[in-house]
Amino acid sequence: MVPFVIANYFPWYDLEDWTGGCTSDTPLESYNSDDSGAIARHIAQAQRAGLDGFAVHWFAPDDRTNANLSKVLSLSPANFHSTVTFLTHILPGKNQANVVDALRYLIASHTQHSNFLRIGDQPLITFSDMYRVPDEAGHLPADDAAAIAIWSAIRSHVDPAHNTIWMAEGLVPDYMSVFDGLYVYKIDHASYPEDYVKAPRWAGWVRSWEAKTGVVKYWAGTIQPGWNDLNSAKPGCEDLRVSSQPFARDRENGAYYQRTVDAVLPTQPDFILVHSFNEWIEGSMIEPSTSYGDLYLELTARHVAAFKALR
């Protein structure tokens, strides 16, 4: 397969988000995520950074993230292909049927777009927060085994023939009994500092599963420039993320970013996920900012080139 690099993209900002004190930095140009001009600018910046597409974080058909996914796809040039990170299951009040309906809608409404990301002829979809999936009654699973059973039921209703590629997020290899590969979202945090050094272990899980079953599985390596969600602990800055200790990782003028790349490249990932293009609450963005200018677009372009030179 042709190597590619995508970045997590968050399409839910309002102008007041840049003045509320919940972020550690601000974009060079303030924007509302619904603005087509801002989306077009982001696509151009991403291409300048060597990215091949976005993983657009997507909540539901009736959410603004759906309209903004459509804008990303329609505004992209022919060589920029995006997917979604599916999040319907983490919304309050959802149940298994809601997740099934949302996935059916997503596949029917978006994956046939010429700018939707594919591996071969199969659309690729990423998922996050695997253990937060509700059952038929809307209850959360007691453990990963129960979550895997729920996801298995969902896939049997939505895509039993595996016509689409589903990437699971997390550190439990058994999700590959339902999903087609693994990636890790949070590669550094307060509970497990510098967790990115475990990339060879995570890749090994995927390759071992593949060897054991004879079924092709995909490993996506995650790289990131830094992290700073300290301001998310302020009153009024709560969001849908699972509560965790606020944490900051110094970018070291790009040296930290390089270390995450150095951990991932030897694992020969099928593709790379940059976390993130614009996760401002977590402070992991490469989007041009007040503090860093466009430095991280430039560094990302170098890292993308290094990855593709190996393939």
Each language-model region and where it sits:
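Glycan-processing catalytic domains of CAZymes
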Residues: 1-311
